[in-house]
């Protein structure tokens, strides 16, 4: 009796909620490209697990923000990487896909690639924002890079790294014209009148650093415009509990806190005050005027500054190549500064029309059927590996 061929094995690691979204999109695409019975396993979050992914370790173990803040978690994170490397070298997968989390994944991809395991990395790290030493690390670790932004492929190919532009799955998921009224009805918000969405982050460290400033800014805006309403999504029950002391210390705010549904909350809004991150791209795809802010501990900020970061940190500005929305960062992010800038974004109709044009063009560029494009590249990498003598 002929032996049955072994099933394909796709190992994958995602270390952030945004990576969980990207990886789940890729898993959906791979399901239609690879044979039934293909095994998908590694480190992932709830969206990946919902597709049938076998998470050997929970993604939350890797979700640590900032240089200084990560120090106390380094032993556990390195232990997880060492154990996963041991497992993958003992039973090599058909391909390894690292999704974002470059500090963790490059250290895993390098020895896997040296052992002959094909490596694909989904989401190019910010080589265009930081000094270029990282690109040498990429060249040693990665067989093929999946890029979510169009300008990244040329930078990588110049350094000898195979790369494909696959677009961003958020651009496929979000409609070109947002349904603001429908979102308000779905959330039970007022159908008339101005609404500002406020997103201070999803980690305790973020809430501790910028939460009080955001709440003080809300209070100032409401004082200036009593008709204003605010909506704030809480991604988890734990985050809602983190926000409770801030809510209690600012009684009388016209603030609705939703259970998750961040995209719906932003869709319902006329303007957004948001902590920097992938969510700023989501806000741009929803065609919303916004103010981007963040605060990190002083030492982390100094390290970032010395690394040569771009003059802008928000993805809408990075993609546009100029400041199209304001960024108010670190000690400049006072309640008054945030309140004034956000109200200006809310009131300026000419700016709103200009941003809608800019963000619509951006949406078309990023809308590339990412799941299928990325899956095609991963499948081709597997085929090349199988064709080796």
From Swiss-Prot:
Q: What is its EC number?
A: 2.4.1.182
Q: Which organism is it from?
A: Paraburkholderia xenovorans (strain LB400)
Q: Alphabetically, which GO biological process terms does the record hold?
A: lipid A biosynthetic process
Gene Ontology MF, one: lipid-A-disaccharide synthase activity
Q: Does the keyword Transferase apply?
A: yes
Q: Which UniProt keywords apply?
A: Glycosyltransferase, Lipid A biosynthesis, Lipid biosynthesis, Lipid metabolism, Transferase
> Which Pfam families does the record match to this protein?
LpxB (PF02684)
- InterPro entries (alphabetical): Glyco_trans_19
What gene name is listed for this protein? lpxB
PANTHER family associated with the record: LIPID-A-DISACCHARIDE SYNTHASE, LIPID-A-DISACCHARIDE SYNTHASE, MITOCHONDRIAL-RELATED
Name under which the protein is recorded: Lipid-A-disaccharide synthase
- Which family does the UniProt entry place this protein in? Belongs to the LpxB family.
Q: Which domain of life is it from?
A: Bacteria
- Catalytic activity annotation: a lipid X + a UDP-2-N,3-O-bis[(3R)-3-hydroxyacyl]-alpha-D-glucosamine = a lipid A disaccharide + UDP + H(+)
Pathway where this protein functions: Bacterial outer membrane biogenesis; LPS lipid A biosynthesis
